[in-house]
């Protein structure tokens, strides 16, 4: 999956960090 603009994807697959 992709994260919203301005957010980063967590390396552990925990979702997105905004």
Curated annotation (Swiss-Prot):
Q: What is the lineage of its organism?
A: Eukaryota, Metazoa, Ecdysozoa, Arthropoda, Hexapoda
Instruction: Please list the residues that carry the modification Cysteine amide.
Output: 18
Q: Which residues form a coiled coil?
A: none
**CC per GO annotation:** extracellular region
Q: Give the stretches traversing the membrane.
A: none
Q: Which domain of life is it from?
A: Eukaryota
What name does this protein carry? U1-poneritoxin-Ae1b
Q: In which tissues is it expressed?
A: Expressed by the venom gland.
GO MF assignments: toxin activity
- Stated family: Belongs to the poneritoxin-Ae1 family.
UniProt keyword list: Amidation, Disulfide bond, Secreted, Toxin
Q: Where in the cell is it found?
A: Secreted
Query: Where's it mainly located?
Result: secreted
Detail the disulphide connectivity of this chain as listed in its UniProt entry: 3-16, 7-18
